[in-house]
Amino acid sequence: HLLRRAQEPSNAADMAKIKDSDQPKDCLQYGDEAMTRLLKQKKLPKPSRIASIQEGDDEAKKVWKEIQDSGIIPKDVKQKKGQTGEGGATNMGVDDNGYDSSKDPDCWWTASQCTKPKHNNKGMMPDIYTCPEPSTFGLTFDDGPYCAHNEFYDYLKQKKLKATLFYIGSNVANFPYQAQRGLADGHDICVHTWAHRY
């Protein structure tokens, strides 16, 4: 799936030198040996597929069981069922036609912009959606990393800005050097699902 090209950068520092104006050079597939090995050994889920704990990953299974047993995830939280209606699915594959917030046990921001969980779980805090300090803002970016992000990272660096970058696991597998650059530049990195199917 990931190809190695002799003329392509082989590390994050070399990849950072490529600019968007060099496209499609910065978007040619490249193969990081460690990432390619992890994918071939099935240590990572297949890119762009809904992830599950990999077979034989006993540590991950143990951690997942600890999370479930801790009670931090309310027992009544259920995955919204996806429906494909006329013209395709809505809200990342979840149909909100006829959605009634009062009957939903969850706080579904996509449908109602609610910010406070309805569950009686002490560990579930309301969403942070405002910055109470005047002239302050939070800077976040979703769905990275992407092959053409070098100029984006350069811009943030030039403006002396740090951001929270929500990376999709499949994108990290496909563009590991861009992911490393975000981390090396001092940004906060958060997981944004493996495949962004919802």
Residue ranges and their predicted role:
Residues 2-131:
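Non-catalytic propeptide/linker segments at domain boundaries
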Residues 71, 78-198:
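Active-site beta->alpha N-cap acidic-glycine motif
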